UniProtKB/Swiss-Prot annotation:
Signal sequence extent: 1-24
Disulfide bonding pattern of the chain: C41-C81, C47-C69, C54-C79, C58-C80
Swiss-Prot/TrEMBL keywords: Antimicrobial, Disulfide bond, Fungicide, Plant defense, Secreted, Signal
Subcellular location: Secreted
Name the UniProt record assigns to this protein: Putative defensin-like protein 114
Source organism per UniProt: Arabidopsis thaliana (Mouse-ear cress)
Cellular component, GO annotation: extracellular region
Keyword Disulfide bond: yes
UniProt record, GO biological process: defense response to fungus; killing of cells of another organism
Family, similarity comment: Belongs to the DEFL family.
Length: 84
């Protein structure tokens, strides 16, 4: 079964036209101008060592981008880690 040049060219053009739409449909529902980040807060223990303790906790234990100590309603600083 021989594939002619016209059939091959049509197949390649269809692939080039369809592939961008398949790739774009797999992305999340962001507008393109924002990065989806999520915070996850843990107890106050990592913040007892200051900012560096929270940062070390988030990177080493939880594998997040970074961490920061934030004041919560219970008037204690909790270690909140930010994900991608």
């Amino acid at each position: 079964m021989a594939i002619t040049k016209k059939c091959f060219a049509a197949f390649v053009l269809i692939l080039l036209f369809v592939m961008p739409f398949v790739y774009c449909s797999e992305l999340d529902n962001t507008s393109g101008f924002e990065i989806k980040q999520e915070d996850k807060c843990y107890g106050p223990e990592p913040c007892k060592n200051g900012y560096e303790g929270c940062l070390f906790f988030c990177v080493r234990i939880a594998y997040y981008l970074y961490g920061e100590c934030t004041m919560k309603p219970d008037h204690q600083k909790h270690c909140c880690c930010v994900t991608k």
